Amino acid sequence: MISRIPRLLFENILVPVADVLTKSVSNFAGHKSDQSYNSNATRVSTISDEEIEFYLNLKSAVLLLCLALCIAGFSVLMYFLYVLVFVPYNRVKRLGSIGYQNHEEGHLSKKDIANLVRRRRKVGDDLPPVFPNGWFRLVDSQQLEPGQVKQVTALGEHFAVFRSKSGKASILDAYCPHMGGNLAVGGIVKNDCLECPFHGWRFDGDGKCVAIPYSEKIPTFAKTKSWPCREVNKAIFVWFHCDGKEPEWEIPDISEISTGKFTYKGRVEHHANTHIQDVPENGSDLAHLSHLHVPHAMSGANLSTQYSSWWNFAEHIFKAQCIGPADGEPHISLFYLTHYLHVFKRFKLLSLNLNVYQIGPGIVHLHFDSPFGKGVFVQTLTPVEPLHLVLTHNLHASWSIPVWLGRIFLYLEAIQVDRDVMIWNNKTFEPRPKLLKEDSLIAKYRRWYSQFYTENSPRLTLKSEDGNGW
């Protein structure tokens, strides 16, 4: 039966279409294939042999064109199916793409509005330090191939992140100590070292200069700063401490990822115009879950219209329980979250149980158990500069959650984060919020989070000549 399908398509679709197109083109060109009448109304054929040959050749050409278009369309369809089924999801929301739909300066571009909001936003003197101490993601593992170097700007620093030929990742200061050349722009990885594009000085992963092409002797001062680096859970992290202290704790390895039990399904990246503490503080703000995130994800991320969507027959219901700091690991905070979809206020569908681990100021592991299988969202937060951060969610899940289903998970999760970003992009950080007793977890969370600030942690200062700056 299946073998007959191409023949049936050819005979019942392509050939009739070719006939119609051929007649149309032939008539348009002045080659009439029908019969004409003489003065006595007697039908006389006027088709010559040349016209018959022209007609047949034209029909063959049109038939081949239709066949080529069908093959091209089928190829495009198969490509999109391949991407949907096998290619991990990758969605990036740049700064300015979310949360500025209803701004008073609606005639401006989103990029201009985003910059305008950043300049005009009320920033008080009590804003917490902008760069806490801890581990922060710079790139995902799959984004850095062996022998490749990338420039990453984060935490007020410029990093050269490179992977040696043997596969080891290292992080150096981007600027060469010799004459300030940028090691990550034009630099070349040679074996386990990074060569400066300016004069050819070569540095190993520890920052030591191991070769200078025009000097036989390498002076002891020929070295650059090497940053503590860890590659864990398919991402590369840097340790930042304002006082230059060595790492005080390590990032937990998720065994299901390292052993391959969970496979990579995709990622979502958001750029947000906010203070880094605003983002993880969401976990302790239970009241916002039952308001901001209740409308179904398909009702969209625009907060002014989501409640008017016809998708409101279904609602997201969240219940959370905060556990607090982990025993013996004060840098980790735990809480449990349950979710289900409430349809027509009667049926509970798609239940989801999450164990959430806040690890330092910039990492969150969200382990979930769903009707489709188990998995983990690895959330990372990295400040690019004061009040501008990158938020990523990488999904790793069991074989029972295929890539196409992972795409749906990530898409729905991204819409919920879009709603948060719309709030973050337009809010100010309130250092002394007016909290109710029902908001007590927020105060507890802020006390816990304060451990990642020290006396010398960088703060945002105000410059009258150009607005916000250092």
Swiss-Prot record:
Membrane topology field: Single-pass membrane protein
Function: Catalyzes the production of 7-dehydrocholesterol (7-DHC or cholesta-5,7-dien-3beta-ol) by inserting a double bond (desaturating) at the C7-C8 single bond of cholesterol. Essential regulator of steroid biosynthesis as this reaction is the first step in the synthesis of the steroid hormone Delta(7)-dafachronic acid.
Cofactor note text: Binds 1 [2Fe-2S] cluster per subunit.
Compartments, as annotated in UniProt: Membrane
Reactions that this protein is recorded to catalyse: cholesterol + NADPH + O2 + H(+) = 7-dehydrocholesterol + NADP(+) + 2 H2O; cholesterol + NADH + O2 + H(+) = 7-dehydrocholesterol + NAD(+) + 2 H2O
Membrane-spanning segments: 67-87
GO cellular component: cytoplasm; membrane
Every Rieske domain range: 136-238
Signal peptide, first to last residue: none
PROSITE patterns found in the cross-reference section: RIESKE (PS51296)
Family recorded in the similarity comment: Belongs to the cholesterol 7-desaturase family.
Pfam families reported for this sequence: KshA_C (PF19298), Rieske (PF00355)
Gene Ontology molecular function terms on file: 2 iron, 2 sulfur cluster binding; cholesterol 7-desaturase (NAD(P)H) activity; metal ion binding; oxidoreductase activity
Top-level taxonomy: Eukaryota, Metazoa, Chordata, Tunicata, Ascidiacea
Gene behind this protein: nvd-Ci-1
Keywords attached to this entry: 2Fe-2S, Cholesterol metabolism, Iron, Iron-sulfur, Lipid metabolism, Membrane, Metal-binding, Oxidoreductase, Steroid metabolism, Sterol metabolism, Transmembrane, Transmembrane helix
Protein name per UniProt: Cholesterol 7-desaturase nvd 1
EC number, UniProt record: 1.14.19.21
Domain of life of the native organism: Eukaryota
Entries under InterPro entries matching the protein: Cholesterol_7-desaturase, KshA-like_C, Rieske_2Fe-2S, Rieske_2Fe-2S_sf
Essential cofactor(s): [2Fe-2S] cluster
BP-aspect Gene Ontology terms: cholesterol metabolic process
Positions annotated to bind [2Fe-2S] cluster: 176, 178, 196, 199
Annotated pathway: Steroid hormone biosynthesis; dafachronic acid biosynthesis
